[in-house]
């Protein structure tokens, strides 16, 4: 296992900026608004040939609102999980009550944990002098640094990695995990869904929309298959996106879909399918990802034996050409159909990478052409000679014909429907390409 380093501190001291500086990428959301990183976020890093995991946490503060209490609990969990801790403060705002509370907590409760005390935003000689007063926290060897320009960070990393055990190297060149992006509008139950699967309070969960702003990876194994769940902030309507945090969160949703094999799109059963849900689904379809639609909070719906059929028919009437997407009714609260959802997602992943022999495809083509003959266009007849599958990350089929311009949309839809039925391609977009031969 790679050693785990946790970044802790009160809100807005620059933890996410330091996180990005160490990893040399814009992974955690960075904003001047206090408390922007509200959950734990773990990413792999490397320094001087040594590998580690870096965890960015929500800010620890003494406020008594529900979100602050959850952030405190998450920070404590992060400290317990970590091999060592970077305790970050801000020289520009000076030592605060929350800084001193964190200092006491670390020295009393976690005295056996390696703590690296850092003072951030030390970017001038005067600020260096000001930073000297931070020894009153009880940490006698503070690191003066600037996460923004990188000064002092290398020295701290040298000492941290020197103190940690070597990571165990494993051969993970061939990643066989199934990557699932858990996406949807705010407050549809994405984090509750992930927590129910993992059996742990891994994410902050409350009824306040947007309590998960960053995308966070969690791994678990089911039936000897490893899964990576990428939980994201909900994608909001543009009118609700603030300049700053919500923009980055929406971008994170898009990036999560880019990384995944299957986009698991959650709906709130009470709200039904909205334009924003279709936007997320279309985003996944355009990127040629598998898609699974989960109608969450089904336990809150009054129903009889026909309710799910009526509900699904209504959904599909609004989905247009996306009828190939499987729909499941779940409850993250009662765990109804949770594992069925994972099994279906795994099946979709297999469908997406399915390879079909050319001989099987041409037998299919022969049967399809005998059932429906392509209509003529401008007096010209479409003649398809053969077909094959093109090597790609999703199913792409090439049809070699006399003139691609003669292919009409209804015939294209017919072939796509029959391909799905014949070769088990539910849940994945497929591409048909007609080429002149």
Curated annotation (Swiss-Prot):
Quaternary form?
Answer: Associates with the 50S ribosomal subunit.
| Function in brief | GTPase that plays an essential role in the late steps of ribosome biogenesis.
Top-rank taxon of the source lineage equals: Bacteria
Provide the binding site for GTP 2.
Answer: 184-191, 231-235, 296-299
Question: Among its keywords, does the record have Nucleotide-binding?
Answer: yes
Q: Could you tell me which SMART domains the record lists for this protein?
A: AAA (SM00382)
- Domain KH-like as annotated: residue spans: 354-437
Assigned protein family:
Belongs to the TRAFAC class TrmE-Era-EngA-EngB-Septin-like GTPase superfamily. EngA (Der) GTPase family.
Q: EngA-type G domain: which residues?
A: 3-168, 178-353
What Pfam families does the annotation carry? Answer: KH_dom-like (PF14714), MMR_HSR1 (PF01926)
Q: Which GO terms describe its molecular function?
A: ATP hydrolysis activity; GTP binding; ribosome binding
> What processes in GO biological process is this protein linked to?
ribosome biogenesis
Is Nucleotide-binding set as a keyword in this record? Answer: yes
Q: What UniProt keywords are attached to this protein's entry?
A: GTP-binding, Nucleotide-binding, Repeat, Ribosome biogenesis
Binding, GTP 1: 9-16, 56-60, 120-123
The protein's name: GTPase Der
Q: What are the annotated disulfide bridges? A: none
Q: Could you read off the lineage of the organism from its UniProt record?
A: Bacteria, Pseudomonadati, Chlorobiota, Chlorobiia, Chlorobiales
């Amino acid at each position: 296992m790679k050693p785990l380093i946790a970044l802790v501190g009160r809100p807005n001291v620059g933890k996410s900026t330091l996180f990005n500086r160490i990893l040399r990428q814009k992974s955690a959301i960075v904003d001047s608004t206090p408390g922007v990183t509200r959950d734990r976020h773990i990413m792999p890093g490397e320094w001087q040939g040594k590998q580690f995991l870096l965890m960015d946490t929500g800010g620890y503060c003494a406020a008594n609102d529900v979100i602050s209490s959850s952030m405190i609990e998450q920070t404590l969990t992060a400290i317990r999980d970590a091999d060592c801790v970077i305790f970050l403060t801000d020289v520009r705002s000076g030592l605060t009550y929350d800084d001193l509370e964190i200092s006491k907590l670390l020295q009393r409760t976690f005295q056996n944990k390696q703590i690296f005390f850092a003072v951030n935003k030390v970017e001038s000689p005067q600020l260096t002098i000001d930073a000297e007063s931070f020894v009153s926290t009880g940490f006698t060897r503070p690191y003066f640094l600037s996460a923004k320009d990188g000064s002092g960070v290398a020295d701290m990393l040298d000492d941290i990695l020197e103190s940690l055990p070597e990571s165990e190297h494993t051969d993970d060149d061939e990643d066989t995990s199934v990557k699932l992006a858990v996406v949807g509008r705010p407050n549809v139950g994405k984090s509750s869904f992930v927590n129910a699967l993992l059996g742990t309070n891994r994410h902050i969960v409350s009824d306040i929309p947007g309590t998960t702003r960053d995308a966070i990876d969690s791994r678990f194994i089911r039936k000897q298959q490893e899964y990576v769940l990428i939980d994201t902030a909900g994608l909001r309507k543009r009118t609700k996106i603030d300049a700053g945090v919500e923009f980055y969160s929406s971008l994170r949703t898009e990036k999560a879909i880019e990384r995944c094999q299957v986009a698991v799109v959650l709906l709130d059963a009470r709200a039904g399918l909205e334009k924003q849900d279709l936007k997320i689904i279309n985003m996944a379809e355009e990127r040629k990802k598998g898609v699974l639609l989960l109608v969450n909070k089904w336990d809150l719906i009054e129903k009889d034996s026909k309710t799910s059929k009526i509900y699904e028919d209504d959904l599909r009437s609004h989905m247009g050409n996306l009828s190939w997407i499987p729909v499941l009714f779940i409850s993250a609260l009662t765990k109804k159909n949770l594992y069925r959802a994972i099994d279906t997602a795994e099946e979709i992943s297999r469908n997406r990478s399915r390879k079909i022999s050319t001989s099987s495809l041409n037998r299919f083509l022969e049967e399809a052409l005998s059932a429906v003959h392509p209509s003529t266009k401008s007096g010209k007849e479409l003649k398809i000679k053969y077909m094959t599958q093109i090597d790609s990350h999703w199913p792409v089929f090439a049809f070699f014909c006399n003139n691609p311009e003669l292919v009409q949309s209804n015939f294209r839809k017919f072939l796509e429907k029959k391909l799905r039925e014949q070769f088990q391609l539910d849940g994945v977009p497929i591409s048909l390409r007609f080429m002149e031969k």
